[in-house]
Amino acid sequence: MDGIKFTLTYSALKMFGKQLYSNVSSAISELVANGLDAKAPNIYLTIDIRDKMNSYVEVFDEGKGMSATDIADHYIKIGYNKRRNERGLNDGKTLGRKGIGKLAALYLSDCFTIITKTVNSELTCWKLDVSGLDEDDSPQLEPVGIDEYCELESYKKLVSLGHGTIICLQNVNMKGLGDKAFESLECRLSNLFLYDKLEQKIWIKLIQSNTTPNCFLPINKQIAFKNLAYVYASDKSYVKECEHNTFTMSYKTKNGIDKKMTSDTEIVSFADTEFHVSGEQEFFGVKKHYELDGWIGIHATIDGEDAKYNDDRYIKNQFYNPNQLRVYVRNKLAMPNMIEYL
């Protein structure tokens, strides 16, 4: 089997990657999103940071997998649009951003391996190594032997399952990332799906030392509902935790005296506001019904101490900002933060 060359140069791929991803968390989230797009019921993320300068990241999804033809025709194409080209398969539910998942892998590592299989194709293993590559050269995916990966738990599960994809990334630099960074990664991953609505499941195993338990933990949606002052919802069942909730916030008087106030969270139905939106629109030549569904919440405070007092699930740091207006389409994240476009 011959190698498969990218159509863009190494320098162009690096440039696109740096523009798309601001940190390790955003790049890893993109790889996980690709697993959700592959219809995987489970996505397993392993991060081994025992040597932070040379960390190991592995994403295994139980999705449909890729054949050698899929790799050649789709995977290496930057900007391949699944929504337009595979409508029957994705049904408008694509989450990854138009064929740029491989840029996320390149952002994280100069060397990564793809092990993949579909129900109707044989298992193949590919490696991309750009270390030492000239800026004007085009990277090439090379077919490699599977022997060194046969002992991976994910490989054994893939063989047993008969379909799926494993991406192994070597020498990922995670120096300077501490507990807050990885806590923030879990928040970012949980934002990929709507609260309590996605049947697919994301699992994570963070290996920090030789004594770390060898088990995956589920990524659970965590929203600091009890720190919300106002909530606008199409269905109040989405925000049950806000019912009969009282929050506290600090303020200064005109004389500079620190005070605290408490108040009840106010919940307003979309039906009573201009937020109630529905109708019909043509999508890719097909007329479909659309309706704005969900909720918008306004935090009572972004002061860390007060917010944590209201709800210990509140997280805000250099790696994660909860003040986002996220848009979901059919239960999956379509726009991470609409506020940036307003």
Model features per residue range: what roles?
Residues 1-166:
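GHKL (Bergerat-fold) ATPase N-terminal catalytic module, capturing the glycine-rich phosphate-binding loop
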Residues 32, 102, 154-156, 190, ...:
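Generic recognition of flexible, low-complexity loop/linker segments
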Residues 41-43, 53, 110, 163-165, ...:
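Residues at beta-strand starts and edge strands
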Residues 67-69, 176-178, 335-338:
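Short helix/loop capping segments that flank catalytic or ligand/cofactor-binding pockets
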Residues 109, 159, 166, 186-197, ...:
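N-terminal phosphate-binding caps/lids of nucleotide- and nucleic-acid-binding domains
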Residues 116, 169-171, 329-331:
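Flexible glycine-/small-residue-rich
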Residues 136-213:
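ATP-binding catalytic core of ATPases
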Residues 206-342:
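GHKL/Bergerat-fold ATPase module in large chromosome/replication-associated machines
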